Amino acid sequence: MPTDLHPDLAALAPLLGTWTGRGSGKYPTIQPFDYLEEVTFSHVGKPFLAYAQKTRAAADGKPLHAETGYLRVPQPGRLELVLAHPSGITEIEVGSYAVTGGLIEMRMSTTSIGLTPTAKEVTALGRWFRIDGDKLSYSVQMGAVGQPLQDHLAAVLHRQR
């Protein structure tokens, strides 16, 4: 654990670093797709982790999505995720985390979604993360454009050294 990591984040120290891997997406309104992803968790000694994510198409490397924000720990076992998307969406997700041995599981769902006038309608989001050593797995559920909350993304990433 980094010596300057805020003590409230000690349980989430295994998230720190850069993770890369591959994922797949689906939704009733689009064709299924595969993507390559890079996620970085960093810190500045305050009680939050900075989060940055970007994806590109697995087939041709074209940029797909990005998001940036902060993962906060307001109290042990609780999480708050604050994110901004360049597509005109902001989200606040609230949830919990559990640490069992070397395994961390986090579950969150939206309590607030902000949309710019030109953003596509998104009504609900949820995320599940599992960190097991140097492997990070996640899934994202989304309710958008008239569709109910359902599976949208899943990926497996590996820590880069």
Curated annotation (Swiss-Prot):
<comment type="subunit">
    <text>Homodimer.</text>
</comment>
<dbReference type="InterPro" id="IPR012674">
    <property type="entry name" value="Calycin"/>
</dbReference>
<dbReference type="GO" id="GO:0020037">
    <property type="term" value="F:heme binding"/>
</dbReference>
<comment type="function">
    <text>Heme-binding protein able to scavenge peroxynitrite and to protect free L-tyrosine against peroxynitrite-mediated nitration, by acting as a peroxynitrite isomerase that converts peroxynitrite to nitrate. Therefore, this protein likely plays a role in peroxynitrite sensing and in the detoxification of reactive nitrogen and oxygen species (RNS and ROS, respectively). Is able to bind nitric oxide (NO) in vitro, but may act as a sensor of peroxynitrite levels in vivo.</text>
</comment>
<dbReference type="Pfam" id="PF08768">
    <property type="entry name" value="THAP4_heme-bd"/>
</dbReference>
<keyword id="KW-0479">Metal-binding</keyword>
<keyword id="KW-0408">Iron</keyword>
<comment type="similarity">
    <text>Belongs to the nitrobindin family.</text>
</comment>
<dbReference type="InterPro" id="IPR045165">
    <property type="entry name" value="Nitrobindin"/>
</dbReference>
<comment type="pathway">
    <text>Nitrogen metabolism.</text>
</comment>
<dbReference type="InterPro" id="IPR022939">
    <property type="entry name" value="Nb(III)_bact/plant"/>
</dbReference>
<dbReference type="InterPro" id="IPR054873">
    <property type="entry name" value="PeroxynitIsom"/>
</dbReference>
<dbReference type="GO" id="GO:0046872">
    <property type="term" value="F:metal ion binding"/>
</dbReference>
<protein>
    <recommendedName>
        <fullName>Peroxynitrite isomerase 2</fullName>
        <ecNumber>5.99.-.-</ecNumber>
    </recommendedName>
</protein>
<feature type="binding site" description="axial binding residue">
    <location>
        <position position="152"/>
    </location>
    <ligand>
        <name>heme b</name>
    </ligand>
</feature>
<dbReference type="GO" id="GO:0062213">
    <property type="term" value="F:peroxynitrite isomerase activity"/>
</dbReference>
<keyword id="KW-0413">Isomerase</keyword>
<dbReference type="InterPro" id="IPR014878">
    <property type="entry name" value="THAP4-like_heme-bd"/>
</dbReference>
<feature type="short sequence motif" description="GXWXGXG">
    <location>
        <begin position="17"/>
        <end position="23"/>
    </location>
</feature>
<keyword id="KW-0349">Heme</keyword>
